[in-house]
C-alpha cells in the first residue's frame, strides 16, 4: 500500500505569503522582489547569494531580505522557489490552504443556495401570476362578448362567442335567429351579425323600424339562406341594402314597381355592380318595364342556376363581336349582356309566333334593345344579344332596305326621335317589309324585346313601351355620329 500523497500546495512565496500559479513565476517573483541588488539592480537566485554579492561588489552588508513580511527576513535561509522552506512553515501553509479552501467551499455553497432560493422564489412568483393572469384575461372576454349574445340567444353558451367570434356564432347563432324572430329578433340579429362581421346588416336593422323592418328580411332570407353564398362577405351587404329598401318601399304600393328592380340584384350578389347600375335605369323605365323586371326578379332569385348558366354564356358573348359595339354605345351594355340571355329565351319563343312581326319588332328593337339592355342590365344580361341584333340591323343590307321604301324621312325620324317612339310606328310597315331579309335578326330582336315584353306585339308593344326609348337614349350617340350610316359602319366592323 503506497502512502497517501500529500496534497500539493499551490506555489507560494515564503517571504511575502503570495500564491502563484506556476513555480517558474514564483522564482521570477523572488528574483525581482526579494533577491535583487538595490545598488546595481542585479537579480540573484537566493538570499545568501544577494548578501555575498553586496559584500564583494559593493562592500556592503545586507541583514534582511528586501520586501519580506516581518519574521521572514532571515537572509541566511537559502530558498529557491518552493525549495528550502522550513517544514513548520510548510505545515502551516497547508493548514491555511485547507482553511481557505473550506471557507471558499462554504461561500460557494451559500451562494449557490442563495441563487437557488432566488430562482425558486422568482419561479414561484412568476408561475403564480401567470395562472392568475390568464384567468383574469379569460374572464373579461367571457363577460364582455358573452353579455350581448346571452340576451339575444339564451341557448348559446356564453364562452363560445368570444372564443370563436367568426364561425361559431354563425353556425349556432343563425338557427336561433329563425325561431327567435318574435321575441327579440332585432337584438339577436344585430349581435350575431356584428360577430359574423356583417357590419352593414346591423346598421340596416337599426335603421329599420322595430318589428316590421325585419319580417321582410326573413321571407327574403329563406330563398337566399339555403345557399351559404349570402353569408360569405359582400353579397350579404348588398342583400341587406336591398332588403332595407324593399322593407320601407314595400309598404307603399306605388314604389313596389321600382323596388323589384333592386331585388333581383340582391338575389344576384355575384354581380352587385351590375345591379347598382341597373337600379337608376329601372326608375326611368315605365310600368311595363317594372312588370317585366318583377317577372325577371321572380325568376332570378329562384333560378340562380339559370343565372350561372347565363353567366357562362356571357363569356361566349365576350367572344361575340357585340361587346365591341356595346362599349362604343355606352359602358352600361356589357353588364346587362348576361341578363339578355335569360330573357332571350322567352323572346325567341314569342318571335316564333309570327315572322312578319319579327322584322318590325327587330327594326324598332334597335332603340328598344338599348332601352331594354339599360333597364334589364340591372336584373339580367341581355346586352350581348341586343348589341348583336342592333349591329345586324345596322348592316348595310338592312339600312339599304330602309331608304328603299322611299320614306327616307320616316327612317330618319326613328333615329332623330330616339326619345320619341311614336314616329317610328308609322314607318314600321315599311321597316317590316325590309325585315323579311332579317328574320334571323328578328330572332335576336325578339331576344331584346323579350325583356320588355314587346315580343308578342312586335312594333305595337314597342310603341307601348316609349319609356324604354329613354334608356335607349344611352345608345343615341351612334345615330348622331352619322345617323344610320355610321352605325352601319360599326356593324360592318362587327
Curated annotation (Swiss-Prot):
Entry-linked InterPro entries: Znf_C2H2_type (IPR013087)
Superkingdom, taxonomy of origin: Eukaryota
Skewed-composition ranges (Acidic residues): 112-121
Principal subcellular localization: nucleus
Zn finger residue spans: C2H2-type: 11-34, 35-58
Keyword Cell cycle: yes
Entry keyword set: Cell cycle, Cell division, Centromere, Chromosome, Chromosome partition, Cytoplasm, Cytoskeleton, DNA-binding, Kinetochore, Metal-binding, Microtubule, Mitosis, Nucleus, Repeat, Zinc, Zinc-finger
Start-end of Basic and acidic residues biased regions: 100-111
Biased composition (Polar residues): 127-136, 323-332
UniProt region (GLEBS), positions on chain: 375-407
An annotated GO cellular component: microtubule
Start and end residues of each stretch annotated as Disordered: 100-161, 250-377, 455-494
Biased composition (Pro residues): 142-161, 463-483
Domain remarks: The GLEBS region mediates interaction with BUB3. The microtubule-binding region is required for efficient loading of BUB3 onto kinetochores and proper mitosis.
Role of this protein: Kinetochore- and microtubule-binding protein that plays a key role in spindle assembly. ZNF207/BuGZ is mainly composed of disordered low-complexity regions and undergoes phase transition or coacervation to form temperature-dependent liquid droplets. Coacervation promotes microtubule bundling and concentrates tubulin, promoting microtubule polymerization and assembly of spindle and spindle matrix by concentrating its building blocks. Also acts as a regulator of mitotic chromosome alignment by mediating the stability and kinetochore loading of BUB3.
UniProt name for this protein: BUB3-interacting and GLEBS motif-containing protein ZNF207
Organism for this UniProt entry: Pongo abelii (Sumatran orangutan)
Taxon lineage: Eukaryota, Metazoa, Chordata, Craniata, Vertebrata
Gene: ZNF207
Amino acid at each position: 500500500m503506497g502512502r497517501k500523497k500529500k496534497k500539493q500546495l499551490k506555489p507560494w512565496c515564503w517571504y511575502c505569503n503570495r500564491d502563484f500559479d506556476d513555480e517558474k513565476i514564483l522564482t521570477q517573483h523572488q528574483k525581482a522582489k526579494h533577491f535583487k541588488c538595490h545598488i546595481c539592480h542585479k537579480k540573484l537566485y537566493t538570499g545568501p547569494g544577494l548578501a555575498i554579492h553586496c559584500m564583494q561588489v559593493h562592500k556592503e552588508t545586507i541583514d534582511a531580505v528586501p520586501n519580506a513580511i516581518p519574521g521572514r527576513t532571515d537572509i541566511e535561509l537559502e530558498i529557491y522557489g518552493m525549495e528550502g522552506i522550513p517544514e513548520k512553515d510548510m505545515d502551516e501553509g497547508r493548514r491555511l490552504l485547507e482553511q481557505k479552501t473550506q471557507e471558499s467551499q462554504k461561500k460557494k455553497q451559500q451562494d449557490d443556495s442563495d441563487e437557488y432560493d432566488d430562482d425558486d422564489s422568482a419561479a414561484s412568483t412568476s408561475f403564480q401570476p401567470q395562472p392568475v393572469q390568464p384567468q383574469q384575461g379569460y374572464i373579461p372576454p367571457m363577460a364582455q362578448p358573452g353579455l350581448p349574445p346571452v340576451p339575444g340567444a339564451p341557448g348559446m353558451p356564453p364562452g363560445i362567442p368570444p372564443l370563436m367570434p367568426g364561425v361559431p356564432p354563425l353556425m349556432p347563432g343563425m338557427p336561433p335567429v329563425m325561431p327567435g324572430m318574435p321575441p327579440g329578433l332585432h337584438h339577436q340579429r344585430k349581435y350575431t351579425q356584428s360577430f359574423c362581421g356583417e357590419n352593414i346588416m346591423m346598421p340596416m336593422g337599426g335603421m329599420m323600424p322595430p318589428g316590421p323592418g325585419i319580417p321582410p328580411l326573413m321571407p327574403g332570407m329563406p330563398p337566399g339562406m339555403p345557399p351559404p353564398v349570402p353569408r360569405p362577405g359582400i353579397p350579404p351587404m348588398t342583400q341587406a341594402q336591398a332588403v332595407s329598401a324593399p322593407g320601407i318601399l314595400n309598404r307603399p304600393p306605388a314604389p313596389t314597381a321600382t323596388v323589384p328592380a333592386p331585388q333581383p340584384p340582391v338575389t344576384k350578389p355575384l354581380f352587385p355592380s351590375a345591379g347598382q347600375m341597373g337600379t337608376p335605369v329601372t326608375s326611368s323605365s315605365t310600368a311595363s318595364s317594372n312588370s317585366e323586371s318583377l317577372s325577371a326578379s321572380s325568376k332570378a332569385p329562384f333560378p340562380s342556376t339559370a343565372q350561372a348558366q347565363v353567366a357562362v354564356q356571357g363569356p361566349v358573348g365576350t367572344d361575340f363581336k357585340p361587346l365591341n359595339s356595346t362599349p362604343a354605345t355606352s359602358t352600361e351594355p356589357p353588364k346587362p349582356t348576361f341578363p339578355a340571355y335569360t330573357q332571350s329565351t322567352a323572346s325567341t319563343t314569342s318571335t316564333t309566333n309570327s315572322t312578319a312581326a319579327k322584322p318590325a319588332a327587330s327594326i324598332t328593337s334597335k332603340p328598344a334593345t338599348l332601352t331594354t339592355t339599360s333597364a334589364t342590365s340591372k336584373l339580367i344580361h341581355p346586352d350581348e344579344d341586343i348589341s348583336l341584333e342592333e349591329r345586324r340591323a345596322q348592316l348595310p343590307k338592312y339600312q339599304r332596305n330602309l331608304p328603299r321604301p322611299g320614306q327616307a324621312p320616316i327612317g330618319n325620324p326613328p333615329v332623330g326621335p330616339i326619345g320619341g317612339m311614336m314616329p317610328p310606328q308609322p314607318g314600321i310597315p315599311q321597316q317590316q317589309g325590309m325585315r323579311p331579309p332579317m328574320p334571323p335578326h328578328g330572332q335576336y330582336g325578339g331576344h331584346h324585346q323579350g325583356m320588355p315584353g314587346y315580343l308578342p306585339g312586335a312594333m305595337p308593344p314597342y310603341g307601348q313601351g316609349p319609356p324604354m326609348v329613354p334608356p335607349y337614349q344611352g345608345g343615341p350617340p351612334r345615330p348622331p355620329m352619322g345617323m344610320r350610316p355610321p352605325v352601319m359602319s360599326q356593324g360592318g366592323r362587327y
